[in-house]
Amino acid sequence: MTDQKTYCGFIAIVGRPNVGKSTLLNKILGQKISITSRKAQTTRHRILGIKTEGAYQEIYVDTPGLHIEEKRAINRLMNRAAASAIGDVDMVIFVVEGTKWTDDDEMVLNKLRSTKAPVILAINKVDNIKEKEELLPHLTALSQKFPFKEIIPISAQRGKNVHILEKFVRESLKEGIHHYPEDYVTDRSQRFMASEIIREKLMRFMGEELPYSVTVEIEQFKTNERGTYEINGLILVEREGQKKMVIGNKGQKIKVIGTEARADMERLFDNKVHLELWVKVKAGWADDERALRSLGYIDE
């Protein structure tokens, strides 16, 4: 009796900010592990999304959006994390938005020229293209810029052609051992996922009011004697005025954020959650490498 062959590969999902990389990953996995919002650079960390079906294991690396401006330390770190992912994988999915092509897209493409991994171009949000006849000449122009292995128009939000993209990825996997147990969907801890859920709710309920330099630190994550997860989250902002915005009038804003975050955590963790949130001013944290290291933005 012979052992069944197994196939495995690492696939980086790259692109400029806000083109739908995290939405695509969540759609492929069939569940939410990477937060999404309309705000650019929602993803700040490299996150692995793992899908195992039978002999095949796809390990997707969701990266922060690559962009030209690097004004603050946190922006430089996110660019570094995204760029380093390109050199460590077996395949790259380059996500762009419809018929738009920006300087940031061009910068990402130039970084891909040094990779030996095959690159799939995923043209996302095709359902938003009003003039459909513009798509074909755009695809032709992009195909002349780079030797893409495949060009696939998709809608990550609606799921259009995502199965075609994933089928191409799976058929390209090389023989190899699985790196994670079959029930794993991410390499990130529950503590990390809790902080990301809170950050997503901040973005959703504050919109344009939300300062870019806001982050979340989980100060406590423990199970009490009743089996409930007790989670304490600290929201860090840079100015006193930002703290007041997050708390809201009579604490209403932070109450809504906490209620929605707790509901999402209970669904994700399949466990009852007691969540407490505080807001603290920490001036200059997004430019302080020691602070960024303690918050998990810099790998040791």
From Swiss-Prot:
Q: Which InterPro entries match?
A: G_ERA_dom (IPR030388), GTP-bd (IPR006073), GTPase_Era-like (IPR005662), KH_dom-like_a/b (IPR015946), KH_dom_type_2 (IPR004044), KH_sf_prok-type (IPR009019), P-loop_NTPase (IPR027417), Small_GTP-bd (IPR005225)
Domain KH type-2 residues, every copy? 206-283
For region G2, the annotated ranges are 41-45
Q: Where is this region: G3?
A: 62-65
Q: Which GO terms describe its biological process?
A: ribosomal small subunit assembly
| Region called G4, residue ranges | 124-127
Report the GO terms under cellular component: cytosol; plasma membrane
Q: Name one Pfam family in it.
A: KH_2
Give the keywords, sorted: Cell inner membrane, Cell membrane, Cytoplasm, GTP-binding, Membrane, Nucleotide-binding, Ribosome biogenesis, RNA-binding, rRNA-binding
Per the record, membrane topology reads: Peripheral membrane protein
Where does the protein principally reside? cytoplasm
Report residue spans for region: G5. 154-156
Keyword Nucleotide-binding belongs to the record: yes
Q: Which domain of life is it from?
A: Bacteria
Where does it localize? Answer: Cytoplasm; Cell inner membrane
One MF term from GO for this chain?
A: GTP binding
Give the residues the record marks as binding GTP: 15-22, 62-66, 124-127
Q: Does the record's keyword annotation contain NAD?
A: no
What does the protein in this record do? An essential GTPase that binds both GDP and GTP, with rapid nucleotide exchange. Plays a role in 16S rRNA processing and 30S ribosomal subunit biogenesis and possibly also in cell cycle regulation and energy metabolism.
Q: How does it assemble?
A: Monomer.
Under HAMAP family, the record lists:
GTPase_Era
Name the UniProt record assigns to this protein: GTPase Era
The opening ranks of the lineage are: Bacteria, Pseudomonadati, Pseudomonadota, Gammaproteobacteria, Pasteurellales
